[in-house]
Amino acid sequence: MAPILGSTLGARWDYIGIFSFLLVISIVLFLIIFFIDIPNVEKGIVKLTEKIEEKYLTDKVFITLVTLGFLIFFTYFSILVYLPTLLNNTYDIGVGISGVLFLPITVSVILGSLFYKRFSKKYNEIMILRVTITGFAMFTLLFGWLNESNVIILSVIIFILGTCVGIVPALLATIISKRFEHIKGKVLGVFNFVRYIGMTVGALLIGIISQPLVAFYFTTITIMLIIIFLYIKIGDFQLKYAK
């Protein structure tokens, strides 16, 4: 619903309409939180009998996974922000219609999360991670070089990228939680924070990249993803993950 509603508001009232709507929603949510008494859920305090390793910020596996999360969502939001410009300039598709084209992206992300639940019962996390990185890197490169070729090809590429994005959060969260069982709340908070930074930076950076340089922009991202894939494939990562 959000892409369709956003495109409708944008087509009629431009960015002022969109941000005014978001402001109203934010005020309503604030009032709900302020006036409605939400009971606190207290979790039992677990006494740890073993020393907890909290040096996660220097842990190579954690840094690798967080960097991967950053890159995935950096790329995804770069595509989301670039897509309206691409559709308008290359395919002559207006803002109102382009919002409808965002709906399959949302669906693909949901499908990705459902696929992960099924895959996780049959395959281990590292195997799923390798396949996901490979697919995302390959289709990121294809998006960079084929985004102006055909709207059908573009739609297929974006759909597959969205599916990979749907798999990533649950997959990385599972791996991180298993590695840092006793402090998973803290490390997942860091992971999500970095992920959101990736979204913001990706959305901002693509805005200053001229259209002729888009292919090289996404090629650079692909190279970084390949480097992470190669690191994950070596035994050192496997041993550290199994620690």
Please provide the spans of the model-predicted regions.
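Helix-loop-helix hairpin linking two adjacent transmembrane segments in secondary transporters
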Residues: M1-F34
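Helix-to-loop junctions at the C-terminal end of transmembrane segments
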Residues: G10, G112-E125, S210
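Juxtamembrane intracellular "pre-TM" segments in multi-pass secondary transporters
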Residues: D37-L68
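A late C-terminal transmembrane helix in Major Facilitator Superfamily
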Residues: K178-L213
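Small-residue (Gly/Pro/Ala) motifs that create kinks and tight helix-helix packing interfaces
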Residues: M1-G10, P84, V201-S210
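C-terminal transmembrane helical hairpin of 12-TM major facilitator-type secondary transporters
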Residues: I126-L172
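Extracytoplasmic gate region of multi-pass secondary transporters
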Residues: V61-L103
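C-terminal membrane-cytosol helix-exit motif in multi-pass small-molecule transporters
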Residues: L23-K43, F229-G235
